[in-house]
Curated annotation (Swiss-Prot):
GO CC terms of this entry: extracellular region
Role of this protein: Antimicrobial peptide against bacteria and fungi. Mast cell degranulating peptide. Induces the chemotaxis of neutrophils. Its mast cell degranulation activity may be related to the activation of G-protein coupled receptors in mast cells as well as interaction with other proteins located in cell endosomal membranes in the mast cells.
Residue ranges the record marks as coiled coil: none
Intracellular or extracellular location(s): Secreted
Other remarks on this protein: The primary structure of this peptide is identical to that of Vespid chemotactic peptide 5e from Vespa magnifica (AC P0C1M1).
Modified-residue entries (Leucine amide), positions: L13
Tissue specificity of this protein: Expressed by the venom gland.
Lipid metabolism as UniProt keyword: no
TM helices/strands, residue ranges: none
Protein name: Vespid chemotactic peptide X
Length: 13
């Protein structure tokens, strides 16, 4: 899993 995507998901969640 890409850290960038994880950061985006973290922002949404």
């Amino acid at each position: 899993f890409l850290p960038i995507i994880a950061k985006l998901l973290g922002g949404l969640l």
